[in-house]
């Protein structure tokens, strides 16, 4: 059984997306037990439409929902101990949940997660890891927004955590890790990036294969399993990729509807275009993972639909099933020369 707590009020649409999304995830993973935190007046009628979900859930009524435009400091002051977001996170501390999933305000979710769960021993700052579609399948990119201007040691930590996530998600024994840079030559880039490369190379970490520097176009190519960068450039890369995907989709839509001949051609090529659309569907890779905390936190896109939210739940489910937290702790323990605090799950 995997216990998943949900911030039902999070996101642009709240329970109207979260509840049907949870129902879809339950169809795929019948061993999920949900712990729901929401406002009963808005959720009860909708939840009643999904009897299987209702039977596999416990619901906790909360008085406060965090707004999508609230500042993290304001959300903490107003919602600590009372909001749906805080209580969903705190369910991990109370041993009621193994992972929390929220589509809510990213800054507030990160602030509450750090305040409530704290960072792992040896981790200075957390990172947000995104699953990225590539020509070879999928890769992991971190950090995509949590730590702006990370130093060399923090980038080293991100490499450790990203490698552990790749082993948990992709089930590769020794994932390849690259540092995002302006060139692949050792003399190029900021001092923090060059120093991080030296740290990773000299550490000779058992669980990862250090590839060296990678450039922006290597992300989509799938050159490495894990791309490490600091939060400013990572977030820009993520938003640029999402915008490019939408741009290409719009170009195709416009080109295929411009003339009668184009419309006829689309009919014959519809299968190929459908496969392309599915490959570029952002819902398929929805679910950023907050790494470096004493608990697994999944951030869904705020504007996603039920299928996208279900995909974020899928990510959380896989992270728990494959022992993400234990893998990160074991890698940190090996790097720092200490004993892991939690036993690794059996292979």
Swiss-Prot record:
Assembly and interactions?
Homodimer. Probably interacts with PlsY.
Which InterPro entries does the protein's record reference?
A: FA_synthesis, Phospholipid_synth_PlsX-like
Q: Which PANTHER family match?
A: FATTY ACID/PHOSPHOLIPID SYNTHESIS PROTEIN PLSX (PTHR30100), PHOSPHATE ACYLTRANSFERASE (PTHR30100:SF1)
Q: Which reaction does it catalyse?
A: a fatty acyl-[ACP] + phosphate = an acyl phosphate + holo-[ACP]
Give the gene name: plsX
Q: Which family does it belong to?
A: Belongs to the PlsX family.
One GO location term (cellular component): cytoplasm
Q: Which Pfam families match?
A: FA_synthesis
Give the signal sequence positions: none
Q: What is its main location?
A: cytoplasm
For molecular function, the Gene Ontology terms on record are: phosphate:acyl-[acyl carrier protein] acyltransferase activity
Q: Which UniProt keywords apply?
A: Cytoplasm, Lipid biosynthesis, Lipid metabolism, Phospholipid biosynthesis, Phospholipid metabolism, Transferase
Official protein name in the record = Phosphate acyltransferase
Pathway field: Lipid metabolism; phospholipid metabolism
Species per Swiss-Prot/TrEMBL record:
Sinorhizobium fredii (strain NBRC 101917 / NGR234)
Biological function: Catalyzes the reversible formation of acyl-phosphate (acyl-PO(4)) from acyl-[acyl-carrier-protein] (acyl-ACP). This enzyme utilizes acyl-ACP as fatty acyl donor, but not acyl-CoA.
Is Ion transport a UniProt keyword of this protein? no
Q: What is its EC number?
A: 2.3.1.274
Q: Which HAMAP family does this entry report, sorted A to Z?
A: PlsX (MF_00019)
Which enzyme type, at the first EC level? transferase
Q: For this chain's UniProt record, which GO biological process terms are given?
A: fatty acid biosynthetic process; phospholipid biosynthetic process
**Cell compartments where the protein resides:** Cytoplasm
């Amino acid at each position: 059984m995997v216990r998943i707590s949900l911030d039902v009020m999070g996101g642009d649409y709240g329970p109207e997306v979260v509840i049907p999304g949870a129902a879809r995830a339950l169809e795929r993973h019948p061993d999920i037990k949900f712990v729901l935190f929401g406002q009963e007046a808005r959720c009860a009628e909708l939840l009643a439409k999904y009897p299987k979900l209702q039977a596999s859930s416990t619901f906790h009524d909360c008085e406060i929902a965090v707004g999508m435009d609230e500042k993290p400091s304001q959300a903490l002051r107003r919602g600590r101990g009372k909001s749906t977001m805080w209580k969903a996170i705190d369910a991990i501390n109370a041993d009621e949940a193994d992972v929390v999933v929220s589509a809510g305000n990213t800054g507030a979710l990160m602030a509450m997660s750090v305040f409530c769960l704290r960072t792992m021993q040896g981790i200075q700052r957390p990172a947000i890891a995104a699953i990225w579609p590539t020509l070879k399948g999928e890769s992991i990119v971190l950090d995509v927004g949590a730590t702006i201007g990370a130093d060399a040691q923090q980038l080293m930590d991100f490499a450790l955590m990203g490698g552990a996530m790749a082993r948990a998600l992709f089930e590769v024994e020794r994932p390849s890790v690259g540092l995002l840079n302006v060139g692949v030559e050792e003399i190029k880039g900021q001092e923090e990036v060059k120093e991080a490369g030296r740290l990773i190379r000299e550490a000779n970490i058992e669980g990862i294969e250090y590839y060296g520097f990678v450039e922006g176009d290597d992300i989509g190519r799938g050159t490495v399993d894990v791309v490490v960068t600091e939060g400013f450039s990572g977030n820009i890369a993520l938003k640029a990729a999402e915008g490019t995907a939408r741009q290409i989709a719009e170009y195709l839509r416009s080109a295929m509807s411009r003339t009668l001949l184009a419309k006829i051609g689309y009919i014959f090529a519809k299968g190929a275009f459908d496969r392309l659309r599915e490959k570029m569907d952002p819902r398929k890779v929805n679910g950023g993972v907050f790494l470096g905390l004493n608990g697994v936190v999944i951030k869904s896109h705020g504007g996603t639909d039920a299928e996208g939210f279900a995909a974020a739940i899928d990510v959380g489910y896989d992270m728990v099933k494959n022992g993400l937290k234990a893998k990160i702790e074991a890698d940190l323990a090996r790097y720092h020369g200490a004993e892991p605090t939690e036993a690794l799950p059996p292979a």
